[in-house]
Amino acid sequence: MAGGGKHTPTPKAIIHQKFGAKASYTVEEVHDSSQSGCLGLAIPQKGPCLYRCHLQLPEFSVVSNVFKKKKDSEQSAAELALDKLGIRPQNDDLTVDEARDEIVGRIKYIFSDEFLSAEHPLGAHLRAALRRDGERCGSVPVSVIATVDAKINSRCKIINPSVESDPFLAISYVMKAAAKLADYIVASPHGLRRKNAYPSEIVEALATHVSDSLHSREVAAVYIPCIDEEVVELDTLYISSNRHYLDSIAERLGLKDGNQVMISRMFGKASCGSECRLYSEIPKKYLDNSSDASGTSNEDSSHIVKSRNARASYICGQDIHGDAILASVGYRWKSDDLDYDDVTVNSFYRICCGMSPNGIYKISRQAVIAAQLPFAFTTKSNWRGPLPREILGLFCHQHRLAEPILSSSTAPVKSLSDIFRSHKKLKVSGVDDANENLSRQKEDTPGLGHGFRCEVKIFTKSQDLVLECSPRKFYEKENDAIQNASLKALLWFSKFFADLDVDGEQSCDTDDDQDTKSSSPNVFAAPPILQKEHSSESKNTNVLSAEKRVQSITNGSVVSICYSLSLAVDPEYSSDGESPREDNESNEEMESEYSANCESSVELIESNEEIEFEVGTGSMNPHIESEVTQMTVGEYASFRMTPPDAAEALILAVGSDTVRIRSLLSERPCLNYNILLLGVKGPSEERMEAAFFKPPLSKQRVEYALKHIRESSASTLVDFGCGSGSLLDSLLDYPTSLQTIIGVDISPKGLARAAKMLHVKLNKEACNVKSATLYDGSILEFDSRLHDVDIGTCLEVIEHMEEDQACEFGEKVLSLFHPKLLIVSTPNYEFNTILQRSTPETQEENNSEPQLPKFRNHDHKFEWTREQFNQWASKLGKRHNYSVEFSGVGGSGEVEPGFASQIAIFRREASSVENVAESSMQPYKVIWEWKKEDVEKKKTDL
């Protein structure tokens, strides 16, 4: 979407704006077995997958029809829900006068006999108001009507969009509407009640349904002082079934009654998942002149600014004045019972943490101290936690921004097949420079064919542009472009939360600042700095660990660790920061005392039995990552550091005993880290190669094989270890002399994918191929049906076997299968040093022995150097009367360390081959078979 004009919200976006996290979508797969994805496939297969969506809202649920796409089923369910709610997307087209009239009509209906027994939360408030005593009997606080009733609140926003952030405006519009119902409604300065009493039979009937389950109850809440210097404290509310809970809250705030209490929107979550609200005093300016919310004097404005509660306003996104109480208590749909949950100081800090992109990620990973929002999205398989697009949507919802608009586009990009030719020589010592140059070129022009870009635009609810993010990079997959653009936007927003988010020295992504722009720096306001509850003296991070070693785990690896973090007072320092006195006579006594003090001054704040993260993307606390990358699997490490001031809010967000943690934070504490490295998965072979080669090595290998197929005029081809059929599928994209293609593999899943791809292409495209067959079998077994073919291929397969099995395959394929031409490729182990950057400069500085590079894939059983590969192929060819030619793809054979993927071409020299009876040995099972004559016959029959 170009420009900043209005866009029509989708049904799902409207549901999200109305209900947020309370709207739960569950999509189920519906398989259509009546249709077949691939005729002739011997493996049991599912039909096309369809989707049905179940949408659960607080008061009801709906089920969509069946659709081919998940998103269509979700939109359908949302549309059904809107119909059931009576919400019309065109409500935004209402005029201000029409909105005012609808508020009047809605208030009249709320105080009708019919609505008194409604299952709406406001109905429960009305019934509770009838149990109030004295002049308050039947009086409903005006803030309840303005906040709890969604229809009234939405109409108030039509009158003035500022209602979104200023709830007091909604109160004024409700009071103005009530003034037009003087014959029906009695309006006090703070509440509304019906002029004529409800019929006695209705009231008596309702009285019999009052729950006795809540006689009196203490509910934990959080008291947030207006003055920033004062500490946020745990508080207690006393609520009961015979008293309106707002009167109890008013009592704690020092107010006359609940009519003077302002209620915020729902936000955040308490310990058990219930959402919270803020309760505060309606500013006197509004109490004294509630019928007119405009035209404040300078004196009034000054008072309101001074009374604004910055911390409370920040966590709910609305203007809160005076002291406030954070609580989870209120009425829900379809219930007369008061719903409540304890809210702790820990809950308050978790809500604060969850307002930022980094905090959302931390909480979702259940690692508030250890985890960090990554600064790079590499692959979906390596990403842990919610995806960037999901986090961005949640962030926008929390800050009352419109749904992000993501627009993907494709564009042709030029080839980079000559990248290596531009570098005369690649040396191990020049790895970093080479990587930097190649990476820079890769970002601008990612490869042959088409690439994807994604643009993100974020608007306010009133359609003011907040952020436009247009990354220049292209990506091979559309989802990668979407996730990277979303992450860019999140990183831009993260700059506003530096004081809340940063754990020590966190790197920032500043390479693409030119990709993002904002129409005004004031559109999105930075959050208030949380008051440092202790000394504001700067704290330097000191990691006390063993001497720094060489990094042994490469970037792109996914590691699994077990860790625990504890807060402890350093026994070497007294509370005033001075070293303890030395007294030889009392050393033993002091040592015992320090040991006891240390033991009693340790608080476990966070632990995780197993968590995974990708190295080199900033997804983990830098101190943890730095230590882990120097470890080996099974190794245990521990170290300590002094937490920076910015980490105090995070520590309070995870600690269970806030009082004790605050006490420790005042005693110059340190963070004790204990880490066990459970496992390491190296960066994927595809990713490492993609960082250096465009087009990818896999495509270069296919092109190399095609060249020899054309030169040999082969008519039959067998792909040994065909996997998902990528080579066979690619062969159909080019004109060749091939008439018969065969694939062999031991993976039924891979063969099924191959069959589906080949089935589609062979039936749609005109080509010379007359037959195609896929076999389930081991290439270590001989099958006479594959004897004496024109060409055999075995690309990047043998390294997945044991080394002796690879040698066995070589013997059998040349002695029994006896192809005229055989192409075998395997990784060049010597090239791994460049791909993995496994020789950092610090090795020379530390005079340590160079580390051996790792295999390119965790599934590889071995990888050969050029010498090993040459010896294997040469001896094999000599024994079986084959000439051998060596080549490769990726890089150059004339410079060190040779080709990235080394290739041997075996050519049969003997003109005559012994005949083998076709039925003599046939261990392979036919999984799928296609014949051109069968297809043509069916067409003729039709």
Swiss-Prot record:
Role: Methyltransferase that adds a methyl group to the ribose of the last nucleotide of small RNAs (sRNAs). This protects the 3'-end of sRNAs from uridylation activity and subsequent degradation. Can methylate 3'-end of microRNAs (miRNAs), small interfering RNAs (siRNas) and trans-acting small interfering RNAs (ta-siRNAs). Involved in plant development through its role in small RNAs processing. Required for the specification of reproductive organ identities and the probable repression of A class genes.
Keyword annotations: Magnesium, Metal-binding, Methyltransferase, Nucleus, RNA-binding, RNA-mediated gene silencing, S-adenosyl-L-methionine, Transferase
Catalytic activity field: small RNA 3'-end nucleotide + S-adenosyl-L-methionine = small RNA 3'-end 2'-O-methylnucleotide + S-adenosyl-L-homocysteine + H(+)
Region (Disordered): 505-542, 571-596, 837-856
PROSITE patterns: HTH_LA
Residues holding S-adenosyl-L-methionine: S726, D745, S778, I779, L795
Family recorded in the similarity comment: Belongs to the methyltransferase superfamily. HEN1 family.
Start and end residues of each HTH La-type RNA-binding domain: 93-204
Organism field: Arabidopsis thaliana (Mouse-ear cress)
Protein known as: Small RNA 2'-O-methyltransferase
Major localization listed first in the record, in broad terms: nucleus
Cofactor binding mode and count: Binds 1 Mg(2+) ion per subunit.
GO cellular component assignments: cytoplasm; nucleus
Effect of deleting the gene: Reduced organ size, altered rosette leaf shape and increased number of coflorescences. Urydilation of miRNA 3'-ends.
Subcellular location(s) of the protein: Nucleus
GO MF assignments: metal ion binding; peptidyl-prolyl cis-trans isomerase activity; RNA binding; RNA methyltransferase activity; small RNA 2'-O-methyltransferase activity
Quaternary structure (record): Binds small RNA duplexes as monomer.
